[in-house]
Amino acid sequence: MELQVVGANALAVSETTFGREFNEALIHQVVVAYAAGARQGSRAQKTRAEVSGSGKKPWRQKGTGRARSGDIKSPIWRSGGITFAAKPQDHSQKVNKKMYRGAIKSILSELVRQDRLVVVDKFEIDAPKTKVLVQKLKDLALEDVLIITASLDENLFLAARNLYKVDVRDVQGIDPVSLIAFNKVVVTVDAVKQIEEMLA
């Protein structure tokens, strides 16, 4: 199959990478796993055993008229322990390489079908100026866009840093969530070739 390149000849690409059937269940599983892996998982609360304080019975069992109590660290007391205290945990889910690559291919194929993948010969700017990048995107009629280049262009990265809904990544930095999140994905010809090699 071929991808149309803006202002240049069409680019021949692999059917298995850019013409794959849409697999919603696979993409959902991989996206959920990716989001789960991004969770910090460091929350920690103290149980009644871990709260600092005396273990002495606050008052005798009978005769005071007050409710019976055996421990100031009881969960029903103010500043007591938490009944089911949250502990640090690893939320990451295992995703096989084959599944991950399959999901990326499926997303790229769907982007092609929806005309959301824009292939350009090169995407460069002369200076790290946001104004220059805004004008370049306006010329291509692009707003909400992910720009993927073969290697990270510092000028491009710095210019896009302050723009809302514009992100710049190299091929190694792409992930299923960012590919889905943007309305358009701009890819250079060299990046397309690298993606094909990476997903082969």
From Swiss-Prot:
Record-linked InterPro entries? Ribosomal_uL4, Ribosomal_uL4-like, Ribosomal_uL4_dom_sf
Recorded superkingdom: Bacteria
Keywords for the protein's UniProt record, in alphabetical order: Ribonucleoprotein, Ribosomal protein, RNA-binding, rRNA-binding
- Region listing for Disordered, in residue ranges: 43-71
Q: Name one Pfam family in it.
A: Ribosomal_L4
Molecular-function GO terms, alphabetical: rRNA binding; structural constituent of ribosome
Gene3D superfamilies with a match to the protein in the record: 3.40.1370.10
Keyword Metal-binding tagged: no
- Could you confirm whether the keyword Ribosomal protein appears in this record? yes
Listed under GO biological process in this entry are:
translation
Q: Name one GO cellular component term.
A: ribosome
In UniProt terms, what function does this protein have? One of the primary rRNA binding proteins, this protein initially binds near the 5'-end of the 23S rRNA. It is important during the early stages of 50S assembly. It makes multiple contacts with different domains of the 23S rRNA in the assembled 50S subunit and ribosome.
- NCBIfam families (alphabetical): rplD_bact (TIGR03953)
Q: Which family does it belong to?
A: Belongs to the universal ribosomal protein uL4 family.
Assembly description: Part of the 50S ribosomal subunit.
What is the designated name of this protein? Large ribosomal subunit protein uL4
Instruction: Report the source organism.
Output: Mannheimia succiniciproducens (strain KCTC 0769BP / MBEL55E)
| Phylogenetic lineage | Bacteria, Pseudomonadati, Pseudomonadota, Gammaproteobacteria, Pasteurellales
